[in-house]
Amino acid sequence: MGKNPVVIGIAGGSGSGKTSVTRSIYEQFKGHSILMIQQDLYYKDQSHLPFEERLNTNYDHPLAFDNDYLIEHIQDLLNYRPIEKPIYDYKLHTRSEETVHVEPKDVIILEGILVLEDKRLRDLMDIKLYVDTDADLRIIRRIMRDINERGRSIDSVIEQYVSVVRPMHNQFVEPTKRYADIIIPEGGQNHVAIDLMVTKIQTILEQNAIL
């Protein structure tokens, strides 16, 4: 292992293309030591709440996340200690009892809508990205994801977007753009920006005597 792992924070609205950017960067370093951490695995455990109450969870509010737990895990990885990454069950609206064992790596990509909102998280990052995509495209992607991956109905997704996602984006997500070192328009389709990011990451790794 090298001296200091590199932490890359990738933020942006729901459906902005954060995951595509993350995967593109990951693929570029596939032969190296790299891992991905999704912020939405670190929603707070709600097993103590009745199921009906969990249904009202606002997943787009900063208080929905257990950032203390996430920060603890990032700090462990920075010190080359393995973690037991949580799994979140979106159908039961709480944290699963199962975990995934994750070994430390030289590059850590932290991705999520609000990874730039908490200063404690920002202070752990070497590079901060914000993926900026038009709202129309984001809602289409959100609808497709929640229906296909989370078993939601189209009516419930649209209702949630209008009443929760959009106002939370405007209040909490969009303002974090100012903390980004680089703003990437058009998400994973912006190959020029991604190539520049890869070059920057390689430079940091070389400086840290990892590559």
Curated annotation (Swiss-Prot):
This protein's GO CC annotations: cytoplasm
Pathway: Pyrimidine metabolism; CTP biosynthesis via salvage pathway; CTP from cytidine: step 1/3; Pyrimidine metabolism; UMP biosynthesis via salvage pathway; UMP from uridine: step 1/1
This protein's record includes keyword ATP-binding: yes
Record-linked InterPro entries: P-loop_NTPase, PRK/URK, Uridine_kinase, Uridine_kinase-like
Residues where ATP binds: G12, G13, S14, G15, S16, G17, K18, T19
Lineage: superkingdom: Bacteria
EC number: 2.7.1.48
GO molecular-function term, one example from the UniProt record: ATP binding
Protein's GO biological process: CTP salvage; UMP salvage
UniProt keyword annotations, A-Z: ATP-binding, Cytoplasm, Kinase, Nucleotide-binding, Transferase
Subcellular location field: Cytoplasm
Reactions the enzyme catalyzes: uridine + ATP = UMP + ADP + H(+); cytidine + ATP = CMP + ADP + H(+)
Chief location category: cytoplasm
Family, as annotated: Belongs to the uridine kinase family.
Protein name as catalogued: Uridine kinase
